[in-house]
A protein has these predicted regions:
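Conserved polymerase palm-domain catalytic core
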Residues: 1
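Regulatory nucleotide-sensing modules
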Residues: 4, 8-65
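Cyclic-nucleotide recognition modules
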Residues: 6-9, 69-126, 133
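Short hydrophobic/aromatic patches on the structural cores and recognition surfaces of FHA
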Residues: 17, 36, 55-57, 76, ...
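Short, flexible segments with low predicted structural confidence
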Residues: 21, 65-66, 100, 128
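Signal-transducing coiled-coil/dimerization helices and immediately adjacent hinge/linker segments
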Residues: 140-145
Length: 145
């Protein structure tokens, strides 16, 4: 499947016009990861986001001394999107569970795309809001346990 066709199926980008999808497809870089390899590490400064093209990954977050598994991601899922907007440290580690291929999009490429395709930002808002609410819920639960 062509990169543009794959991107068109990602929920964040599914409503974009062909020109916007082509701009994103031209900006992403395909990268492969072996099982057990960290794609991003909690605490590191991120420079971009990733879309999983194939494979599966686990999401780990430190809770005390040991990391806890907080989720699993597969084809079409994306992570690291906060790094598209700011330069704060990564909030979680994402590690490949099996051979995994990701499409990487850097902050500077994303910002250039946003200038000519601002509707992408509107697609990102509900996703960021949902993740913020989940984080808030996790903090509240941790405080009450």
């Amino acid at each position: 499947m062509l990169v543009a066709d794959f991107i068109r199926r990602v929920p964040l980008f599914e409503d974009l016009d062909d020109r916007s999808v082509t701009a994103i497809a031209n900006a992403v870089v395909e990268q492969s990861y072996a099982p057990g390899q960290e794609i991003v590490r909690e605490g590191d400064t991120g420079v971009g986001a990733f879309i999983i093209r194939s494979g599966r990954c686990e999401v780990l977050q430190r809770r005390g001394a040991d990391p806890s598994r907080i989720g699993e991601l597969g084809p079409g899922d994306f992570f690291g999107e906060m790094a598209l907007l700011d330069e704060f440290p990564r909030s979680a580690t994402v590690r490949a569970l099996e051979p995994t291929t990701c499409l990487g999009l850097t902050r500077w490429h994303f910002r250039g795309i946003l200038e000519s395709h601002p509707q992408i930002a509107l697609g990102l808002l509900p996703i960021l809001t949902r993740r913020l609410r989940n984080s808030e819920r996790q903090v509240t639960e941790a405080l009450h346990h």
